[in-house]
C-alpha cells in the first residue's frame, strides 16, 4: 500500500501498531483514562514532580505553572493534561497547533478562558509563528495585544486575560523556539513503558472492559506493544475479539499469540510494513548500506512513509542503523528474521572489502 507524503499521520493511525490515535482509540480511551495521578500507571518521575507542582499551587491558592509535555504519541500526554485540570479542580479547554493558524484564532480562545482554566494545546510545535508570538505575552503577562485596523493606521489594543495554565504537548520538542520553551514553568519528557508497566496497563484496561485475561496473556500482549500504552490497549481489544470468536473468551499466552499472528504483529511488535523494510534491506541489498529512496522503491512505499512511519521503531529496537552512507541492518535484524548474513569478501590486501569487489 502507498501513502502520499501528506498523509503519514493517517498511515500511522491505520496500522494496528501505529501510535497515532484513530476514532476507535479516542472513544475507548475516554472510558479507560485514569482520573488522577494515583491511577496513572508509569512515568514515575514525571508523576512525582508534577504532583509537587500541583500540590504547591493548590497550597498557594494560585494557578499551576505552565506545563510542557514531550514524547512519542500514545504515552499519556493528553491524559496528564486532563489529570492536571482535575487535580486543580479547573475546567479544561482542548485545541491543537494545526487549528491555530492565525493570531486571531488564539486571541479568540484566550479571551474566552475562565480564571484558573487549563488550556491544552496539542501538537504545539505546529502552531503558526504569529500565534506563537502572541502566546509569549499571554503566558508571561496574561495579556495580549489585539491589532485593530490595517496598515499605518492599525492600533494595538491590550486585552487583559485571567490567569490560566497552558499545557502544551509535542512529539518534537526541538521544533519549539527557545522563547516559547522558556516560558513553561515545568517541562517533562514522557518515556516509553517497560513490559511490567504495560502489563499493569493491560490488566487495568481488561478489568474496565470486562475482559478475562491471565498473566501470560497480558505479558504476550505487552511484549508486542512497542512500549506504548495506546498500542497495548488496541492490541488488547483485537485479542479480545479473537478470544470471543475462536476460544472461550479467556486471553492466555497461546490465544494472544495466535490472535496477533492473524493481525501480522510478530513477537517483537513488528508488523508487515516493518518486516517488509527489513526483508528488502536484507534480501535485496545484503544488509546495506542502501539509500532511503532506493529502499523505499524496493518496498513499494513512499520515501516519507519508510522514514517517518517504519524506521523510528526499527532504529529504537536496534534492528536498523541510519548512517551517512545509507541504511544498514544490524546483526539483530538478521537474527530476528532468521536469516544468515553474507560472509564479507576479502580484497587483495587481505582486508574485508566493503563493496564485495
Swiss-Prot record:
GO terms for cellular component: cytoplasm; Holliday junction resolvase complex. CDD domains: AAA. Belongs to the RuvB family. The keyword Transit peptide does not apply. Gene3D superfamilies: 1.10.8.60, P-loop containing nucleotide triphosphate hydrolases (3.40.50.300), Winged helix-like DNA-binding domain superfamily/Winged helix DNA-binding domain (1.10.10.10). Its EC number is 3.6.4.-. It is an enzyme of class 3 (hydrolase). One of its GO terms (molecular function) is four-way junction DNA binding. Residues 337-357 are annotated as: Disordered. The gene is ruvB. The RuvA-RuvB-RuvC complex processes Holliday junction (HJ) DNA during genetic recombination and DNA repair, while the RuvA-RuvB complex plays an important role in the rescue of blocked DNA replication forks via replication fork reversal (RFR). RuvA specifically binds to HJ cruciform DNA, conferring on it an open structure. The RuvB hexamer acts as an ATP-dependent pump, pulling dsDNA into and through the RuvAB complex. RuvB forms 2 homohexamers on either side of HJ DNA bound by 1 or 2 RuvA tetramers; 4 subunits per hexamer contact DNA at a time. GO terms for biological process: DNA recombination; DNA repair. SMART domains: AAA. DNA binds at residues 303, 322, 327. Residues 194-264 are annotated as: Small ATPAse domain (RuvB-S). Pfam families: AAA_lid_4, RuvB_C, RuvB_N. Keywords: ATP-binding, Cytoplasm, DNA damage, DNA recombination, DNA repair, DNA-binding, Hydrolase, Nucleotide-binding. This is Holliday junction branch migration complex subunit RuvB. Homohexamer. Forms an RuvA(8)-RuvB(12)-Holliday junction (HJ) complex. HJ DNA is sandwiched between 2 RuvA tetramers; dsDNA enters through RuvA and exits via RuvB. An RuvB hexamer assembles on each DNA strand where it exits the tetramer. Each RuvB hexamer is contacted by two RuvA subunits (via domain III) on 2 adjacent RuvB subunits; this complex drives branch migration. In the full resolvosome a probable DNA-RuvA(4)-RuvB(12)-RuvC(2) complex forms which resolves the HJ.
